Regions:
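Mid-to-C-terminal secondary-structure elements
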Residues: 115-127, 138-260, 463-649
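Intracellular coupling helices
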Residues: 3-13, 17, 21, 279-322, ...
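Internal alpha-helical transmembrane segments of multipass membrane proteins
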Residues: 263-286, 658-678, 722, 726, ...
Length: 783
């Protein structure tokens, strides 16, 4: 330990950086493993999750996916008595966010529909009161956390909330409180309602996900066959399948407000292990860097009677102590990370040690194990060097010593290059998402959900908005283009003339407001109030029997409904209807103005879109629009949002993973630089005399710095050659999550090389500059 204290006093910065690097590597390992654990344990809090499955059916329609997950609730009657199905329940496919009011205060809540048997099926645990023994789901229940946020210490049972739904406020009475579910669960914490009985007998309301619990997972295949035979008796093409509930939330089909994107658990685990390996490389390199400095004292102690075993034991104990200090540092970093809201935005779920006891133990044991292995290797290596080399002072230049140091550092370079390239590709995809041609102009567009009080004043509201000097155009619509993967779906007709498409309800000015180009025919006009369609080019090509200026159902038998027989007035160019997870160019879609015959469907155009003219400030426009809404004497708040900025929400999970990879790449490069710093320290200690002689013989400081920096060229090139295909493969794999994505440009590779190489060379120059500028006489004296 005396030597350790001596070394710390002499090389304070290098020692502290070494400990910081290992601490950061351990903390990074722990954080990424919490994310893997978060994904792996998704829905494991649900009752009998190992035997619970979601029902999906093959989609022969024009949906952008091959499988469909939404059904009318009536379909349950086909399956209730099938063999091997113990229970069957439903969940609304759209978890909503609703505004609720209590004592004049407004709150945003998750709002979820569940089947009447949800308590027994999902394992919902009611609070300890009279409701705890019931088996049927009450009509409205609140989670504990939500109840505390609204009611505080009051008893919520029997209290009335006012929720805004379907353009009106209505009271709901809280009938129970359930215990909170973990964040990684399909059952969200908020307001749960039982509503499926409203849709019994209604085969047109396709909004429910159906879940079944089997008596044994081994019967999955036979149940899939039974589901298909019980429903598709005359079809050999369509079928059902069962998806484990653990995987359901990460499916692209899932429409609840949880994650829709799941980074590969293997990738997350690899990243966490790489973090630990980079820390190990750095720690080992630092231990080896100390070896030449303690060689002479070790030989002296051997002469005085110390055994090789005792010297090795001392070095091992020193390294174990340093590992323990690094563990404490990692724990401190994680606690600091946990206290920072900005940092916590980089992770999902809870990262506290008490909720990850097993992972904490694994991290502790793994780190200590790695520390011991590193210590054993360093101790064996340092004590196995022939004494003659040490006495001559030539160990630092021996081929074996140089090769080992460069191999370790090259391994760090490989990881740094691969992750930098990976991060660059992700950055390219982020740029592509924000800057691709969407087929509509998303810039300078504000939108808002219309308050209930304004629904019946839409004409007046539009008139007043149009009068504002900064408004170029405005319109009402039901949906926001490009921010979802599923919209209202219509299927009409039969046989060869069956059509299926995404139906988007709009008003006559929507295409003009969104700057969507008409390819054939005309745009909507005020005379289309009785109903009209504008198809996208994909729908026009897919269903060629649909003709311009003719009713859409002219050549279609069995339209199935008495309404919607409107003419097709135009064909517009394709636009990005869904997110980039799907190829919008393959999805038939139609804008529709709903006529008086569809009045029973209600007014679906509840969002207002406003295009701001060039030269006007968007923030000031937003402020004035919100003030205008307030003048309608509505108690509800109305917040306008920027359409282009809402992409951040659409790709929230992808952007989270991108941020995590960038964070890892930064830490990886930082730890690698610590390794470079230590190796340069090692080199300069053993080449002091050589540098002094070179300077006496006329070498300049520039030439000495070039001598040190030039030695890194071959390891950097070798590492890049190894890292480039690795980075390309993992980047290609990640891009497969998007149907539309950026290419991997050739210049990503030299850019990654330049980024890492530049910071490495700068580190070498800064560290070796101290020796290069030192008086050569002093170096010769000390050597």
């Amino acid at each position: 330990m005396k030597y350790l204290l001596y070394f710390f006093r002499r090389y304070k910065l290098a020692s502290l950086l070494n400990l910081l690097g290992l601490s950061m590597a351990i903390a990074l390992f722990y954080l990424f493993q919490t994310q893997t654990e978060y994904n792996r344990n998704y829905n494991t809090s649900l009752k009998d999750y190992q035997r619970t499955y979601r029902v999906e059916t093959s989609s022969l329609t024009s949906l952008p996916y091959d499988w469909n997950i939404v059904f009318p609730i009536e379909i349950v009657s086909y399956w209730q008595n099938l063999p091997h199905i113990e229970q069957i329940s439903s969940l609304c496919a759209l978890t909503e966010q609703v505004e609720t009011e209590y004592k004049g205060m407004s709150y945003q809540l998750s709002y979820l529909d569940l089947g009447s048997n949800a308590i027994g099926f999902w394992g919902i645990r009611m609070q300890s009161d009279a409701n705890s023994a019931q088996t049927d789901l009450p009509e409205y229940i609140l989670s504990e956390k939500t109840a505390r946020g609204i009611f505080g210490a009051e008893n919520p049972i029997g209290k009335t909330l006012f929720i805004t739904e379907e353009n009106r406020k209505r009271p709901v009475t809280i009938q129970g409180i359930y215990q909170d579910f973990p964040d990684n669960s399909s059952i969200k914490n908020g307001l749960i309602r039982r509503r499926e009985h409203f849709h019994l007998g209604n085969w047109s309301n396709w909004k429910y996900e159906i879940f079944v619990r089997l008596d044994d997972p081994k019967n999955k295949i036979s149940v899939e066959k039974a589901l298909t035979e019980s429903f598709f008796q005359s079809s050999k093409k369509e079928s059902f399948r069962l998806l484990p509930v653990q995987q359901a939330n990460f499916s692209k089909l899932t429409q609840t407000n949880g994650s829709r994107y799941r980074p590969s658990d293997h990738m997350m685990s690899i990243i966490s292990i790489l973090a630990l390996l980079v820390g190990l490389f750095n720690f080992t390199n630092f231990s080896l860097a100390q070896a030449p400095l303690r060689m002479r004292s070790m030989i002296t102690r051997k002469v005085m009677g110390a055994s090789t075993a005792s010297l090795r034991r001392e070095m091992v104990l020193e390294n174990i102590f340093l590992t323990a200090v690094a563990l404490a540092g990692a724990a401190l970093l994680i606690l600091i990370f946990q206290k920072s809201p900005e940092c916590m935005n980089l992770v999902s779920g809870d990262i506290s040690f008490q909720n990850h006891g097993q992972l904490t133990g694994i991290t502790l044991l793994t780190t200590l194990g790695i520390g011991i292995l590193s210590a054993l290797f360093s101790a064996w290596y340092a004590t196995s060097i022939p004494s003659a080399l040490v006495l001559k002072g030539s160990f630092g230049q021996s081929p074996r010593g140089k090769k080992l140091r460069w191999v370790i550092l090259t391994g760090q370079f490989v990881v740094a290059f691969a992750m930098t390239l990976y991060a660059l590709v992700m950055t390219g995809q982020t740029h592509y998402i924000f800057n691709a041609d969407y087929g509509f102009n998303k810039d300078k567009v504000l939108y808002a959900q219309i308050p209930d009080a304004a629904i019946n004043k839409k004409d007046y509201l539009k008139q007043e908005i149009t009068r504002l000097p900064f408004v170029k155009s405005s319109s009402f619509a039901a949906d926001i283009l490009g921010n979802a993967d599923r919209y209202m779906y219509w299927e009409r007709g039969s046989g060869n003339h069956r059509i299926s498409f995404q139906a988007l309800c709009v008003d006559a000015d929507f295409l003009k407001t969104m700057d969507i180009k008409i390819a054939k025919g005309r745009d909507f006009n005020p005379q289309d109030s009785k109903g009209a369609y504008i198809l996208n080019q994909t729908m026009s090509r897919k269903f060629p029997w649909l003709s311009l200026n003719q009713p859409i159902n002219k050549n279609i038998k069995d339209w199935n409904t008495p309404e919607g027989h409107y003419p097709v007035v135009g064909i517009c160019e394709n636009y990005k209807l869904t997110s980039m997870r799907y190829d919008s160019n393959t999805i038939p879609a139609a804008f529709v103005i709903m006529g008086p015959d569809m009045a029973d469907w209600g007014d679906r155009n509840k969002k207002i879109f406003v295009r701001i003219a060039q030269g006007y400030d968007k923030l000031e426009a937003k402020k004035q629009l919100e003030q205008l809404i307030k003048q309608l004497d509505t108690e509800e708040t109305c917040e306008f949002r920027f359409l282009d900025e809402d992409l951040q929400i659409t790709y929230e999970e992808e952007f989270l993973f991108i941020a995590q990879v960038r964070f890892f790449a930064f830490i990886c490069i930082f730890i690698t630089l610590i390794g470079v710093f230590c190796l340069t320290l090692f080199e300069t200690e053993y080449r002091r005399k050589e540098i002094a002689i070179r300077k006496i013989m006329g070498s300049t400081v520039h030439e000495v710095l070039l001598l040190f920096a030039g030695r890194y060229l071959i390891p950097l090139l070798a590492a890049f050659v190894l890292a480039a295909p690795i980075g390309y493969l993992i980047s290609t794999k990640w891009l497969q999550n998007f149907a539309e994505h950026t290419p991997i440009y050739w210049w990503f590779f030299p850019l990654a090389f330049l980024m890492v190489s530049t910071v490495v060379v700068l580190t070498v120059v800064l560290q070796s500059g101290r020796v290069a500028t030192e008086n050569p006489v002093n170096s010769i004296k000390t050597e």
